[in-house]
């Protein structure tokens, strides 16, 4: 353990260094403070923790396996690659870890109505799932662009009893869906619980979502010690808002021997401006209730993000990631659409696992790094979700490629 802990944040104001905070409408402030207090009580309440553990085990299907990717390891010819199989969770991604935690909190607070934003649709599906399980009304905000590319997930949400509200504003993606959800929350503050899907938003959301996702890193630690007798040498995860990454990273932040790498979406390339890499191509600003790195123009207006992956298509990043970038504890790189698609195909062909396009960004980074590392280097990559939802996108890109070469 290091003498200075990287795991004590945020402070009482919800700040991680100069990032985070509570930039919300006055009407929301009492609710935000109430939520923060309720969460502080819940996280030390044995009954709450016992119920959370029960649902993680028997409903979500945890622990998720830590799998030695033998053929990917052979393919790279260097580091030993392990996959943390979050795509095997109920609903097919890491999102359910957070949704179970927050729905138990919503029920504890007596809320009858759940709202959420979604990009790739996985958080929407997970929210609709837990709302159905606990008999609560559910409204999901989703941008029209994302609805077009994630029709299967839209149908799943409706099947689970949720109302899906299309958002036409802006580019019709995650940022716009989050704006609408925040407007709804201000209007229906008494009855409604806003179930945010990532480590962004006003305090206490970044810390709360991280805590519910930290089960990923805690399990990884135990599982790798059991398999290899030691901690990993490096961790790799993709980043949109950054909840799957923070869930893997947080339990290891105070281990100086563990290198940590977050992977943003470079889209068509950082230099083109068509990307979603807030740390590699953005500047600090305020969005959705917190101060963090954002994609902005010279006038401070939010620039639309681009990624082939709907779940990474966000012009900001969780404030704790912004702080970890600032202090240099975590290295943040970026991967293009093309590189992610190549990694997607490689994983399918070599391991018989169809990863989400989000997770494929992390895999692409692994394929760059692993060949340069010694064979005894233990590398864990978070396979945050499965790729069923991305078939339409991948088919479209393969078709384009075939037509180009015809």
Curated annotation (Swiss-Prot):
Record-listed E.C. numbers: 4.2.1.20
Catalytic activity reported: (1S,2R)-1-C-(indol-3-yl)glycerol 3-phosphate + L-serine = D-glyceraldehyde 3-phosphate + L-tryptophan + H2O
Residue spans crossing the bilayer: none
Alphabetized InterPro entries for the sequence: Trp_synth_b_CS, Trp_synth_beta, Trp_synth_beta/beta-like, TrpB-like_PALP, TrpB-like_PALP_sf
Superkingdom of the source species: Bacteria
Cellular component aspect of the GO annotation: cytoplasm
Pathway annotation from the record: Amino-acid biosynthesis; L-tryptophan biosynthesis; L-tryptophan from chorismate: step 5/5
Coiled-coil spans in chain: none
Keywords: Amino-acid biosynthesis, Aromatic amino acid biosynthesis, Lyase, Pyridoxal phosphate, Tryptophan biosynthesis
Top enzyme class: lyase
Any one Gene Ontology molecular-function term assigned to this protein's record: tryptophan synthase activity
Pfam family, one: PALP
KW rRNA-binding (keyword) present: no
Cofactor field: pyridoxal 5'-phosphate
Chain positions found as N6-(pyridoxal phosphate)lysine: 95
Signal peptide positions (record): none
Quaternary organization: Tetramer of two alpha and two beta chains.
Function: The beta subunit is responsible for the synthesis of L-tryptophan from indole and L-serine.
Protein family: Belongs to the TrpB family.
The name this protein goes by in its record: Tryptophan synthase beta chain
